[in-house]
Amino acid sequence: MGSLPQLSIVKGLQQDFVPRALHRIFEEQQLRHADKVALIYQPSTTGQGMAPSQSSYRQMNERANRAARLLVAETHGRFLQPNSDGDFIVAVCMQPSEGLVTTLLAIWKAGGAYLPIDPSFPANRIHHILLEAKPTLVIRDDDIDAGRFQGTPTLSTTELYAKSLQLAGSNLLSEEMLRGGNDHIAIVLYTSGSTGVPKGVRLPHESILNRLQWQWATFPYTANEAVSVFKTALTFVDSIAELWGPLMCGLAILVVPKAVTKDPQRLVALLERYKIRRLVLVPTLLRSLLMYLKMEGGGAAQKLLYNLQIWVCSGEPLSVSLASSFFDYFDEGVHRLYNFYGSTEVLGDVTYFACESKKQLSLYDNVPIGIPLSNTVVYLLDADYRPVKNGEIGEIFASGLNLAAGYVNGRDPERFLENPLAVEKKYARLYRTGDYGSLKNGSIMYEGRTDSQVKIRGHRVDLSEVEKNVAELPLVDKAIVLCYHAGQVDQAILAFVKLRDDAPMVTEMQMEARLKDKLADYMTPQVVILEHVPLLVNGKVDRQALLKTYETANNNEGDSSIVLDFDYSQVPEDLKLTARDLFETVGGVIGRSTRATLAPHSNFYELGGNSLNSIFTVTLLREKGYNIGISEFIAAKNLGEIIEKMAANHDAVQLEEESLNACPHLKMEAVPLRLEHRQEVIDIIVASFYNKADLEQWLKPGVLRTDYSDILNDIWNVLVERDLSFVVYDTNTDRIIGTALNFDARNEPEVDIKSKLLIVFEFLEFCEGPIRDNYLPKGLNQILHSFMMGTAEKLNPRENIACMHFMEHEVLRVAREKQFAGIFTTNTSPLTQQLADVYHYKTLLNFQVNEYVHSDGSRPFGDAPDEQRAIVHWKEVGK
């Protein structure tokens, strides 16, 4: 007898729920915690050592009450009416500040809903929002021109709080509020619309409360958790739980200025200072922070952000590789990473998944989006609204208490449907997400979009909206807008444009400047002007060909005829080497898509830089020996300032012995390898190659730590006898911090390798053997083979570079002293490849690692990226 098929319907836990107005919950907290700190704010421009401003729960509540009374009076006094949905909306155009949070609370207390307008929004977007949502008032920062709001009444924050100063500070009674306190909608957030026009999502108090109650039950605040952080843009739905979750539980909120959020160095310092224990962020910011943490704090005894134990990723797809790299830095079982899925229409989150370990993540091709939140149900439906079977792909629909009330002016009613599958009243409505999903082993997997929407830095962007704005430019004949590598590090919105035949000369950057007046920053595409639009046989646009065009132009290893333009004319003579290092590094990171000359006056971000590749650029500069901080790099107005900082902080790497030590506190001395060094050398090599090796990472989990020690134990006595290897002592601590292992290439011992490391050694022989046997000097004492070099795990990046430089110089000294003809080595690490360039090694082979075919026909390094290379180098020691 057959069994019934399991259908893709997943129900969250059922929690008791009593609808309440959110500001009333805050008022209860104020009674319990009147004198506790509620708000902490330190402007990004505040001088060093100055105390941040703080407000207690009582102060915040009374100030909000007075402001609320003024808002009610202004509304009645100006005879202002609710909009067509019956909502009293107050738009807020303010930067993150202490006053911003109090103003939002005041709007609720007055009986209104707040609608955030980012100060950076272009005029046409603001105009559309005001025209459609019809807010009664706009509250703005003092320095924002009231004329931007085109006739809608405005109040500056100074006016709001000055005029309300004499009003009562007690809580408002329901009858004092707009609509007698029958406030239903709490927040209106504008998102990208499928028709190319932004639409406002109406979020009720009860939906927000259900989302918060699930959070409080699932991730309760601990006794030692005093401060939480508010750093997400107010226009982004994740700001709701980030801001109001802690304030309705008696915690303090640390308001982070935008400038700090964009600077990993300052953000990490702030999170450390206040011992923040949880953080909500988009995967892009997580990647930036992990890069920074590994660069700055990976070797510290107490890791940076160790106190931050709950990490929530939301707003973009979370890749398995990024989630795994989280556990490369943080501890499994101590630190937790969560993948949240949703949209503004479901309060940002309707499902979640807990990432627990690298082993767990290795079971997935993509990180699941998990299971539903409390009081919600997720359905995967086919085109006829019938649940699909487990494992099949269906469109994701959500129902329950997390749903929005709909859109402003009742737009797009087809997105909110009557639920034919509902039994209980709270599940009577369905929201159509426009995403595909499948149910596998109890978890929902994200399977892509049904339309042209993508997530950019956590913001939902409909490509049709971008395309509509591009097509409206007067010179454009045809526009096609696509997203390159959606959800990945190099994600980009691209506008492929064919100009009208009669169009005058115009550059891509000029067109982008025009679009910045029409679109938000995160929506502004990179323009690519085409001579003709490629078509498929059926006459449709060949979108893959367009993406390939962009990819080819951005591939640094691709068309060698594409040359980046560097202008050194304004660089002082003594800084030209430094400038060359910077320009080449920036060009390599940003790629050939930059259409501007790299010159001292160039701005990194205008060239195409962003927060993620700024960290990568600094990492590469540090590998070249330049000690420049992330904050210094980000704050620089142009490349000229960066050149000066690079030169001031650390001169370009020199080969002279007195300049080798990039860390003055390290006093290094090379000592020939001795028998008693065995364990320390093994520890260093194992740590260097097991944890950081560029080839072995693709063979895990098959490679063990003991595999390295077995090989070294086998050859140890020979290494010592040959007297070509050495260790490096830090004479301040009398500890070994590095080791270089060398052999005569014509007199190497045979080793019986039974582990998976045999693949690595066979690959190295594949690269080196033909060159060594056919092109290098014959006989003994001719080729010094530098085959292993490692540094102590405790060294920070600067110390690591200094030690590597010292060892490279010492290998040269050994080769000369022992009268070898030259040094032979294969470098698989970007750092040692850079050092080989510095020491003028000759490249004999540059091999793409993922193309190696093993003797059994497999490609053991097939998952390596195309840019990972193994470079065989040779240096004649007399040169």
Curated annotation (Swiss-Prot):
Histamine binds at E696. Disruption phenotype: Reduced histamine levels in the head; specifically, in the central brain, beneath the basement membrane and in proximity to the lamina neuropil. Fewer synaptic vesicles in the terminals of R1-R6 photoreceptors. Loss of carcinine production in the head. Photoreceptor response to light is abnormal. Electroretinogram (ERG) recordings lack 'on' and 'off' transients probably due to an impaired synaptic transmission to postsynaptic cells. Induces a darker pigmentation of the body. The pigment stripe near the posterior edge of each abdominal tergite is darker compared to wild type. One of its GO terms (cellular component) is cytoplasm. Keywords: Catecholamine metabolism, Cytoplasm, Ligase, Phosphopantetheine, Phosphoprotein. Its main location: cytoplasm. GO terms for molecular function: beta-alanyl amine synthase activity; long-chain fatty acid-CoA ligase activity. Induction: In the brain, expressed with a circadian rhythm with high levels at the beginning of day and low levels at night (at protein level). GO terms for biological process: amino acid adenylylation by nonribosomal peptide synthase; chitin-based cuticle sclerotization; circadian rhythm; cuticle pigmentation; developmental pigmentation; dopamine metabolic process; histamine metabolic process; locomotor rhythm. Optimum pH is 8.4. Residues 666-679 are annotated as: Condensation. PROSITE patterns: AMP_BINDING (PS00455), CARRIER (PS50075). It is an enzyme of class 6 (ligase). Nonribosomal peptide synthase which is required for the regulation of histamine and dopamine levels in various tissues through their condensation with beta-alanine. In epithelial glial cells, plays an essential role in the inactivation of histamine, the main neurotransmitter in the optical nerve system, by catalyzing the conversion of histamine into carcinine. In the cuticle, catalyzes the condensation of beta-alanine with dopamine to form beta-alanyl-dopamine (NBAD), a metabolite involved in the pigmentation and sclerotization of the insect cuticle. Belongs to the NRP synthetase family. The nonribosomal peptide synthase is composed of three domains. The adenylation (A) domain is responsible for the adenylation and activation of beta-alanine using ATP. The thiolation (T) or peptidyl carrier protein domain (PCP) contains the prosthetic group 4'-phosphopantetheine, which activated beta-alanyl-AMP is transferred to via thiolation. The condensation (C) domain both performs the selection of the amine substrate, dopamine or histamine, and the condensation of these amines with beta-alanine via an amide bond. This is Beta-alanyl-bioamine nonribosomal peptide synthetase ebony. It comes from Drosophila melanogaster. The lineage of its organism: Eukaryota, Metazoa, Ecdysozoa, Arthropoda, Hexapoda. The gene is e.
